């Protein structure tokens, strides 16, 4: 039986990182990890509409600004971004929000970008928020090939209403996967 593969590609650009992820379609997967140093203009060529893109940093600090800006100048759309936040209006990932490049954002703190909030309430952007520790563990688990995990943090709140829930040791837990 041939295994599907998921490829984790880390680009290190001036101390910042961008990881491209393909969506996991089956659990029986071969994991390939590739690390390269590339120019931002070369990294941009690898991103296609519909991709899942993971960006480091928080609050417009520590993220690959040049890469974000170069992608903002393309016609790429329907991206899912995994990032702590969505920048501020028209700054950092806020450019992607303003350009309507995103279909979904997964992270911890989106309320700083009022344009993202407006698109969310208008039903034009899917935002999936979670506590910071759950976000970090989701990334770690995904990088290790773990399909998901149960956590009690946030269980029973509006943030986890869409998640599978179980009671474990008399505590409500919800299933988390990126």
Language-model features and meaning:
Residues 30-178:
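Conserved alpha/beta enzyme-core scaffold
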């Amino acid at each position: 039986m041939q295994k599907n593969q998921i490829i984790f590609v880390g680009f290190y650009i001036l101390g910042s990182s961008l990881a491209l992820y393909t969506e996991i379609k089956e659990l029986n997967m071969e994991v390939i990890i590739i690390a390269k140093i590339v120019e931002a203009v070369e990294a941009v060529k690898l991103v296609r509409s519909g991709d899942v893109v993971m960006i480091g940093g928080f609050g417009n600090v520590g993220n690959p600004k040049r890469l974000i800006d170069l992608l903002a100048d393309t016609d790429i759309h329907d991206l899912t971004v995994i990032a702590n936040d969505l920048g501020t209006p028209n700054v950092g990932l806020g450019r992607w929000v303003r350009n309507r490049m995103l279909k979904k954002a997964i992270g911890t703190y989106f309320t700083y970008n009022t344009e993202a909030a407006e698109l969310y309430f208008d039903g034009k952007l899917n935002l999936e928020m979670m506590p910071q520790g759950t976000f970090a563990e989701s990334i770690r688990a995904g990088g290790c090939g773990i399909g998901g995990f149960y956590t009690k943090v946030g269980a029973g709140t509006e943030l986890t209403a869409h998640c599978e829930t179980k009671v474990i040791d008399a505590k409500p837990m919800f299933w988390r996967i990126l």
